[in-house]
Amino acid sequence: MFEKVVIANRGEIALRVARACRELGIKSVALYSTCDAESAVVKFADEAVHVGPNHPGKSYLHIPNVIGAALKTGADALHPGYGFLSEDPFFAEICANNGITFIGPKPEVMEKVGDKAIARDLMQKAGLPLLPGTVEPVGTADEALEIGASIGYPVIIKAVAGGGGRGMNVVRREEDMARLYQTTRATAQAVFKDSAVYIERYLDAPRHTEIQLVCDSHGNGVYFFERDCSVQRRHQKLIEEAPSIHLSDEQRRDIGERAVRGALSVGYTGAGTMEFLLDHDGNLSFMEMNARIQVEHPVSEMITSVDLIQEQIRVAAGEPLSVSQDDVKLRGHAMECRVNAEDPDRDFAPAAGKLDVYVPPGGPWTRVDSHCYPGWSIAPFYDSLIAKLIVWAPTRPEAIERMDRALSEFQISGRGVKTTIPFHRRVLADERFRSGDVSTDFVEHFLAGEAAKVA
């Protein structure tokens, strides 16, 4: 097992990793930018190192500073969290070259699954279902037109290196294909420094379903069931829950086993997520793989009672998984609301500031993952996440009621600070959400309905 882990991240995930390290008897090193000097993880970790000014490109994304901090403190491993450098194969390789174990997949594996066209090809060969489309980059506008005619409109053009909802365009008519093909390539080059794109059939209003898995270096892989992440706005998730109420036990087992086989077939090690689209006929189609822990991992932990961060650390240290597939049981229903410093009444505009009041909720089966405290200033340089509020209950209706109760207790205020709590409570009261009739267009229609009522 590792002796010391440097945490190349900030906010709630950095604190989450530091806590896992302490429970495993591992010393932790927090990295912090200038404005994060008083952050909760800096106070909690065994050591802390300043890595640069507030701009992430000069601190959390500045590889020489991050590696320098790891070497300076004698850390033998590095946990990247999510975001920042967590899916950068170049960074993972630099860690390895400096004798630091990157807690995640090997660089060459990360590169394979990070290229969405290559990942589609590999997962198709491993037996995962795919939407009709290409498994190789589309080289010309003429080729794009041929593909559109072959699979039928609408289609979606995606950057092979894309992520976070960027680098994609939906094409509904043949006459728009050439223009949107060139637009997507230009965006991909500007944002991801890679102009390659692929094309697949576009599903209107599918459900977003993802499988959580962990694989070790001994050929073992375990899936921790699925999450439904359909409540999202502009491809940014707002509410996640587990399990999906739209999968049968047979589907759940089948897609979980296929996801693990797919991951093992490419030599994957560590925690990862297979993302799928679920159509209204119950068909699942592989979309992409995320080679890291995800923001919403707590809901999977709540329904399985397995600490996924600790599993990540164990397998990176060369240990086998601490659980087998037979050990992992699905119990009850969990839900997570992302409490962000945003104003839902102003198109989710940033609403950061100093927290004068911060009182998280309590009660049975109620969990708050947060780095915030009274007096903490939410910096405008990073994401707007204040806290992840997670609840568990025996059934989904009970989980909804528990979440609403917990949200009603959550006290957050400060000059200029607004949160998404009122939005979440309105969603929880919506009959469509309560019935589970939710797809990726839910928030768009929900907000339009609210606007119509005001008008």
Which ranges hold each PLM region?
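Conserved beta3 strand of the protein kinase N-lobe
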Residues: 133-134
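An N-terminal boundary/leader segment
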Residues: 1, 164-165
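ATP-dependent carboxylate activation and anion-phosphoryl transfer catalytic cores
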Residues: 6-28, 48, 71-73, 89-91, ...
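ATP-binding N-terminal substructure of ATP-dependent carboxylate-amine bond-forming enzymes
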Residues: 1-125, 138-146
